[in-house]
Design a protein with these regions (language model features):
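Transmembrane alpha-helical segments of polytopic membrane transport and secretion proteins
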Residues: 1-46, 286-302
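Periplasmic/extracellular loop-to-transmembrane helix junction in inner-membrane transport proteins
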Residues: 26-32, 64-108, 253-274
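Transmembrane-helix boundary motif in ABC transporter permease subunits
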Residues: 55-58, 104-138, 151
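Generic hydrophobic transmembrane alpha-helix motif, especially the helices
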Residues: 80, 84, 90, 124-125, ...
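Amphipathic cytosolic juxtamembrane alpha-helices at the membrane-cytosol interface
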Residues: 88-103, 127-135, 185-189, 194-221
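Transmembrane alpha-helices
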Residues: 99-115, 204-236, 284
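Glycine-rich helix-loop "coupling/hinge" segments at transmembrane-helix boundaries
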Residues: 155-156, 183-184, 225, 232-276
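C-terminal transmembrane helix and the adjacent membrane-cytosol boundary/short C-terminal tail
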Residues: 171, 217, 224-225, 267-302
C-alpha cells in the first residue's frame, strides 16, 4: 500500500522577502501615523502659545480690574471661569497668568538648553581636564535637592521675573548636558571623525563642522521637553511664595490665593487655572515624546 504524499507545511519564514515587505509597510504606516500626530500637536501647540500670549497682552488690564458687585460669581456665560473675592474676572486672570508662565518657560528652557549644549560639547571635545571639571560640576548640581537649589537661586537673585528665569534655567540643564556629552563621545569614535582629526583639524573645527549637525535633533527634543518642566517648576516656586510677587497674576499666585477659599465652596478659583496649567504641560510633554520617537535613532523601532 502506497503512502499518501505529504507536502511540507507552509511556514511564514519560507518567504523572507514577503515578511520583510509586510513589516516594512507596517512600520511605515506606524511612522507616518506618528509623524501626523506630531505635526498636529506642533500646530496645536504653536497656535495655543500664540493665542495665550496675544490674549495675555490684551488681558493685562482686565486681569486687575476689581468690582465688588460681581465678586464670587460661579462660572456663567458672562464669566466662563467665574470671579474671585475681589470681583476680578478669572478667565482674564488665567489667560494673563498662563502667558506669564509661558514666557518664563520659553526663556528658561532656551537658556538651559543652550547652556547644556555648550557644556556637553566642551566636556567631550576639549580634553580630559575640561571633561573632569564639567562632569564634576554636573554631579555637584545634581547632588543638591532640586527645589532647594531653585529656592536658593530665586532668593539670591531677588523675587521677580529675573530671579525665576535664572533659577529655573540653572537647575534644568544637567540631564541634557549629560546626553549631549554621551552623543559627542560616541561620535568621536566614528571613522570619519578620526580621519578628520588625523588631517590636523582642530577640536573646535570638528565640533562645529561635523558634530553640531548630528546633535541638533537631541537639542530640539531636549528643548521641547524642558519647556513643560520649566513651566511646572515656575508655578511651583511661585505657589510656595519664592517666585513672582503678588502683583503679577501668575498661575502659581492664582492657585496659592485660591487655596484659602476652597473650603468655602469656591472651587472654580483653583479648578480652571489648574486645568489650563495641566493641559499646557501635557500637550508639550506629549509633543516632545513624539519628536523624540521620530528623531532619535535609538528608538526608531519602538
Amino acid at each position: 500500500m502506497k503512502e499518501a504524499a505529504t507536502f511540507p507545511e507552509k511556514r511564514l519564514d519560507a518567504y523572507p522577502e514577503k515578511n520583510f515587505a509586510e513589516n516594512e509597510e507596517g512600520y511605515r504606516k506606524k511612522k507616518w501615523n506618528r509623524r501626523k500626530i506630531t505635526i498636529v500637536l506642533l500646530i496645536v501647540a504653536t497656535g495655543f502659545l500664540t493665542a495665550v500670549c496675544i490674549g495675555g497682552f490684551f488681558c493685562k488690564e482686565a486681569a486687575q480690574v476689581t468690582d465688588f458687585s460681581r465678586k464670587n460669581l460661579p462660572p456663567c456665560l458672562s464669566y466662563p471661569f467665574g470671579t474671585d473675592w475681589l470681583g476680578r474676572d478669572m478667565f482674564a486672570r488665567t489667560v494673563r497668568g498662563l502667558s506669564i508662565s509661558i514666557i518664563i518657560g520659553v526663556c528658561a528652557a532656551t537658556f538651559s538648553a543652550v547652556m547644556a549644549f555648550i557644556l556637553g560639547v566642551v566636556s567631550a571635545t576639549m580634553g580630559k581636564t575640561a571633561d573632569a571639571v564639567v562632569t564634576w560640576f554636573i554631579d555637584l548640581v545634581m547632588g543638591i535637592p532640586h527645589m532647594l537649589l531653585l529656592i536658593l537661586i530665586c532668593v539670591a537673585c531677588g523675587r521677580g521675573l529675573k530671579g525665576v528665569i535664572l533659577g529655573v534655567a540653572l537647575t534644568h540643564w544637567t540631564s541634557l548636558a549629560r546626553l549631549i556629552r554621551g552623543e559627542v563621545l560616541q561620535l568621536k569614535e566614528q571613522i570619519y571623525i578620526k580621519t578628520v582629526k588625523k588631517l590636523g583639524k582642530s577640536n573646535l573645527y570638528i565640533a562645529m563642522k561635523h558634530m553640531v549637525p548630528h546633535l541638533l535633533p537631541q537639542f530640539i527634543v531636549g528643548l521641547v521637553l524642558l519647556f513643560p518642566h520649566a513651566i511646572l517648576h515656575e508655578s511651583s516656586i511661585t505657589f510656595l511664595g519664592f517666585g513672582l510677587s503678588n502683583e503679577q497674576p501668575a498661575i502659581g499666585i492664582i492657585l496659592s490665593e485660591a487655596m484659602k477659599y476652597l473650603v468655602t465652596g469656591k472651587w472654580w478659583l483653583a479648578l480652571f487655572p489648574g486645568i489650563m496649567l495641566i493641559l499646557t504641560v501635557v500637550c508639550f510633554f506629549t509633543m516632545g515624546e513624539n519628536l523624540r520617537m521620530l528623531l532619535d535613532p535609538a528608538s526608531v523601532h519602538e
